[in-house]
Amino acid sequence: MNYNAQVLRSFLTRLGYRAADVYQEFRFAAVDQPSRPVRQVDAAAFLDGPASYRTAALGVVRTDANETVQQTVEATRSLGAPFLVVIEDDEASMWTYTASGVTQLDSTSASQWQTLLADHKKFGPGPIRLLKALQVREDVPTTGLLFDPRTLYGIQASTQLALDELLTQFLSHFDGARTTAGQLSLQTHYEVLFPLVFRLLAGKILIDREDNRISSIDPDDPRQVVATVETLYSLSPQRLQWTKARVTQLASAWLALREGLYVRNVAADDLAFVYENTLITPETRKAFGTHSTPYSAADYVIRSLRLPEGNAAAQLRVYEPFAGACVFLTAALRRFKELFPQSWTVDKVHEHLVSHFVASEIDPFACEIARLALILADYPNHNGWRITRENLFESNHLADRVSQCDVLLCNPPFEDLDEPIEGLSIHKPVVLLNTVIKTPPAFVGVVMPSGFSTHKVYREHIRHICEIYADVEVMLLPEGVFRHASIGAEVLIAQSRRGDSIIGEGSSDESTIRKSIVRRTDWSRFTQTLKTSSSDVTQVNPRTSPGLVALRPLRRIWDYLAESPV
């Protein structure tokens, strides 16, 4: 059988994959298995760098002696490749992953394994890229190849759980209940420890990915790892007195991190969720009104927007006020990488992103964490992210920033202003809505307080939004999904700005309005599939049916009575 490293690389590059994106003996963590073992495929092709389950396209592997073909396929799910060729003895078979499980697509003799992937119109980078780009308003995959891109959200959920456990274990070495005199304590030194976590995570990524930029250092020395990461990404050195007790403490924590989850195939932007999920403190939430954004909610918003592709996507300016750890911006970063011209180099994409993606945040600590999160999300590129520390409720900052963006994404604080400011509502969410109505961006995705769609405080704002945009959705999220906050929330998604020639939509007098609901019992499913529990959709004329009136529970009864003779 013609099956060796050179043949594998040559075949995958002929399909259209860049040589730099084809790997032999690629190792990855099987995050969907309890022990998260490190698995290996003989070859893997990726859409672009860095290699991760999000960019994986194809895999080729031989079965282990103690596994069946189906067991091998199931154990390889976390690679993230839509298609896997498995060779067992004299037979080769091709498999894919669906929402209901693994599915065999074809088979042939082992000597003819290349014929299973020979059609570049199906298995080249372009078709695979489209296949993995999930649109949440599509009920079923648009391909005849069966692969369901929602499968990737199952991998994402498993990955984020594994990362949470990894970092919780790391931070346990700094638990004040366990530390001794002179050691670092999470309760006392969290403003030092949290940035340290990100520096060490970046170092672990570089080490697990065998990055040449870190190959010359001693990987067992965490302080050397931190110093190297700070140099690579132009980060300010941490000022901390390293006593013998602290050095010993850090070495023990770093060992747990080093020997924990193998992160080579982890999508770097998954690490951005760590701040809001694992690192946000009750003190920070109380001081700045921070309520962490579920990553799946941010993904749902981004993938609900009908963003243009190619050069048109490159014209859009994206802004996240009240950014926290930039969960929305990192989700947008991932989506826009799918939309940019495929001819763009990695350097070109990075250069464009740092000039068109900006954020604002009042918490200085969150600003640093957000910048570190974006650095990790944009691995292996350099720094350059613009995270401005500012109080957006002062000096008309919010209005100025929103007027300059095309895509507005955020989770604002829900609290009232401490003191009244002339010209502004005392309710912070209302201030944001007033700004959107005054200078409406082309695309809007913002989190609002629970009751937004029904409370009289927001009635006029919703009416204006439905007049400005021809496509409006409100998604209701259950209580308990915002970490460190017991309240639920509603997400406003607005697009198809009327009279917008660039987007090419919104010229009709009618609007499409949606009300989607995610029930508490369905939250786990939503995080893995982005499927809501229910969605009510209708077409209305916003002048005769203002706001969300058409989606009220008794709408169909009133419509029937209006059309029926008495």
Where are these regions (language model features)?
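Conserved beta-strand segments of alpha/beta enzyme cores
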Residues: 356, 384-386, 473
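Conserved SAM-binding loop
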Residues: 370
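Residues that flank catalytic or metal-binding motifs in active/ligand-binding sites
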Residues: 353, 388, 488-490
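Class I S-adenosyl-L-methionine
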Residues: 146-355, 360-367, 391, 396, ...
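Signature of N6-adenine DNA methyltransferases within the class I
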Residues: 4, 82, 86, 91-95, ...
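Short, basic/polar, glycine-containing "phosphate-handling" surface segments that engage DNA
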Residues: 2-200, 253-269, 470
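Well-ordered alpha-helical segments embedded in enzymatic catalytic cores
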Residues: 71, 296-301, 431-435
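Structured loop/turn residues at beta-strand edges in well-structured enzyme cores
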Residues: 79, 269, 313-316, 352, ...
